[in-house]
């Protein structure tokens, strides 16, 4: 199951191919991704972050073993072969425990790595870039690399213990700013310099040697860098290839290495393709997929209001707003401005903090109510044209069933299609 190593080999041979990573735990997003990969007969890379999923449950309430079981069960139900499914762990390190002393945070990180590897995750992003309670700010490359090497050793031992061989594929390094979109308004972003990328690589190579891990270097397939892409609440910084030329050329000197780009959400299809051509050949996407889910649900809620008496409506949007106001912890520190600005951000921000609320039981009940209301009788075509125009074209051509669920999934797949096209290669 060396899909990633083979992808890198082909890319280094000039194929200009890549792979996208679906970073979401939402069942409809995952179903959309599995069905899309199945239809296109491609492997599928699904990643969990250290915030979402950890040995204590993360914010999803799932351990790595739970997440794997959930994804594999979904794949089985959709007849997707498990050997075409790659599970990755993103930003694995002391990220969740920065408020603890480094010794304690790293002990937790050891256990985090063990839980991911034992559960069968094969793509492991080692990220120890964050300072803990008693650390200097920022950490030196050497400290970051030493901690990553420590975790790599734990990962290798765990993999051999559980699977009889060490076949993990690693990603190292980190992008700045923090995972999940920038908190501030952006105008321009500094691209990682070739010297900084080389320093990260050399520090890691040296630290891995000290741990006796020379042999795993060919399995370090990617370095996370900042190619100059990011988004905030209402803006996207588009990829500018010319600004990343030196960085792109630098990786050509490394035989088994490509770059991984985070926060590629909302880039244009042309930018996504150019990123892959420029060796940023692993494209991470998450918020853009749940943003598309939210768009589809808001559109269906508007259709429901046209068709269903007010008393019988799901009230999905109002339920969502009420829950977000009752439990503001996932958006309050991100969204600023007056009451109206924050209301708009809660519903529409590119950073899509609303994604943290979909599992809430009240919201889930309203979602189920919405789907029931619209599944009772066919949705009139003019309303699909009004609120989901891209799906309307497919409904009219006969390639899409106009049921609520299929409309949602297809809308998400429109985003996946952009990533698929960007990664196809020549």
Curated annotation (Swiss-Prot):
Top-level taxon of the source organism: Bacteria
Protein's UniProt name: D-tagatose-1,6-bisphosphate aldolase subunit KbaZ
Family note: Belongs to the GatZ/KbaZ family. KbaZ subfamily.
Gene3D superfamilies xref list: Aldolase class I, putative tagatose 6-phosphate kinase domain like
Functional summary from the UniProt entry: Component of the tagatose-1,6-bisphosphate aldolase KbaYZ that is required for full activity and stability of the Y subunit. Could have a chaperone-like function for the proper and stable folding of KbaY. When expressed alone, KbaZ does not show any aldolase activity.
UniProt-listed PANTHER family: D-TAGATOSE-1,6-BISPHOSPHATE ALDOLASE SUBUNIT KBAZ (PTHR32502:SF2), N-ACETYLGALACTOSAMINE PERMEASE II COMPONENT-RELATED (PTHR32502)
SUPFAM superfamilies listed in its UniProt record: Aldolase (SSF51569)
Assembly and oligomerization: Forms a complex with KbaY.
Pathway: Carbohydrate metabolism; D-tagatose 6-phosphate degradation; D-glyceraldehyde 3-phosphate and glycerone phosphate from D-tagatose 6-phosphate: step 2/2
Listed GO biological process terms: carbohydrate metabolic process; D-tagatose 6-phosphate catabolic process; phosphoenolpyruvate-dependent sugar phosphotransferase system
Record GO cellular component, one term: plasma membrane
